[in-house]
Swiss-Prot record:
Protein name: S-adenosylmethionine synthase
Pathway assigned in UniProt: Amino-acid biosynthesis; S-adenosyl-L-methionine biosynthesis; S-adenosyl-L-methionine from L-methionine: step 1/1
Amino-acid positions noted as binding L-methionine in the UniProt annotation, renumbered to this chain: 58, 101, 248, 279
Catalytic activity: L-methionine + ATP + H2O = S-adenosyl-L-methionine + phosphate + diphosphate
Amino-acid positions noted as binding K(+) in the UniProt annotation, renumbered to this chain: 45
Biological process terms in GO annotation: one-carbon metabolic process; S-adenosylmethionine biosynthetic process
GO cellular component labels: cytoplasm
Amino acid sequence: MATETFLYTSESVNEGHPDKLCDQISDAVLDACLEQDPDSKVACETCTKTNMVMVFGEITTKANVDYEKIVRNTCRNIGFVSDDVGLDADNCKVLVNIEQQSPDIAQGVHGHLTKRPEEIGAGDQGHMFGYATDETPELMPLTHVLATKLGAKLTEVRKNGTCPWLRPDGKTQVTIEYFNDKGAMVPIRVHTVLISTQHDETVTNDEIAADLKQHVIKPVIPEKYLDEKTIFHLNPSGRFVIGGPHGDAGLTGRKIIIDTYGGWGAHGGGAFSGKDPTKVDRSGAYIVRQAAKSIVANGLARRCIVQVSYAIGVPEPLSVFVDSYGTGKIPDKEILNIVKETFDFRPGMISINLDLKRGGNNRFLKTAAYGHFGRDDADFTWEVVKPLKGGKLATA
């Protein structure tokens, strides 16, 4: 019987991409603030262009933070150690323009730190989405998982010397042929793999293609998804020597789909990096990922999306929504009731239940490259599945 299939694509960028560099600097600042003062209020933006990084925003903290040192260390650790590769961590200009959080916002959200956790209001209005699908062990879309892992592997083989010609900047993209199984997504095969990576002057395009196939694609993409029809575009522009902030300007919060679900589900538009957990752009998105993942892991649906929305200064969410795309074992209305009974969507309680005030150990820096979801790391507390009533993980 002929089955109707369709193509779907997700992209990723690795840690040397200028936008991702900015995300990582913003989250490194957040980590430093929270490590010394868990009640820090942080809204840290970063931008970069040739030979310059600027950190700006609103931060209220008791922490003693050396912003310039954080910027230089983060750039250096990524591999930006000379003008040749796109930025020189030790010699670039670092500009800092940080002010305190607006007292108007402070009184409305946390009462200048006088409110109890359950009273803390959302730091802003907005709506956030969580998504999960049973197509991978991570309960994430395979297009996104493979694009992200290719980017991480590019960085790994650059840093361990396997491919010494690699430079920090790079992008990946994966197209997969899917079958729609009554609302659930079933990957059939990888249709197209695209990698564009920064490189030095010494390497030929043929060498680039051979190394990428052998050391990046082969270890990442399971053989069962590749066939003789799979298309490979490996550095299709023909030259990518100039990269990093020298090639393109970078800005925090410009890779929000890469940070989440690769175009699947939905996105409320709010970025994550550089924001403390009173910012529901981040904490709200984390709790609805935990809810969506728990729904699928408990077998209540094969695929689902969860939305939550907030008003500034108000603790209780304005709305919670669940859609199982027709894959639910029980009606969506019942799943929604179980979600509302199980998860506390008030921002102050999200912070406690997901331990989001804990910085240090590169806790949030780790989230700022290669995705915030589907990661196997104890610091990613929102990836912990909760047993749900009527689900297969619920105790009798």
